[in-house]
A protein has these predicted regions:
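Mg2+-dependent phosphoryl-transfer enzymes with acidic/Ser/Thr/Gly-rich catalytic loops
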Residues: 2-10, 26-28
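Short, solvent-exposed loop/turn segments at secondary-structure boundaries
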Residues: 23-26, 106
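Asp-based phosphoryl-transfer active-site loop
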Residues: 9-23
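Active-site phosphate-binding/coordination module
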Residues: 30-126
Length: 126
């Protein structure tokens, strides 16, 4: 293995079983590792198959969390300076918004023909 590896600039962490333990909590050791990483300029990004609205508050409240990868990688969000507020403002009552809409930096849609093929395959097993 080469000793001249480039420095780590971004770490994407899956939620269940990686960032969150079996109780849905972030352990003190994991919190400490994330704090050290962000202090060293590493961007730490939670990554999940869940939609943005299902990002657990314990994750959104982690210091240094600014971005989130959701929907199995189909969307990448800039949560701004108030990640928890951004997560909830996206789906909350407009009159109660605590922050501006998060910016969706990337959204990949499945081509219509691929969706039709997948649906046809699914119907074979109905």
């Amino acid at each position: 293995m080469s000793q001249n590896l480039p420095p780590v600039r971004l770490v994407a962490l899956d939620l269940d079983g990686t960032l969150l333990n079996h109780s849905g909590e972030i352990t003190p050791l994991t919190r400490e590792a994330i704090a050290r990483a962000t202090a060293n300029g590493v961007v730490v990004v939670p990554a999940t198959g869940r939609p943005l609205a299902s990002l657990p508050p314990v994750v959104a409240q982690l210091p240094g969390i600014r971005y989130a990868i959701t929907s199995n990688g189909a969307a990448v969000w800039d949560l701004g300076s108030d990640p928890l507020g951004a997560v909830y403002s996206r789906y909350a009552n407009a009159a109660e918004r605590r922050t501006s809409e998060p910016a969706c930096l990337l959204r990949r849609l499945m081509p219509a023909e691929t969706a039709r093929e997948a649906f046809a395959l699914f119907q074979q097993y109905d």
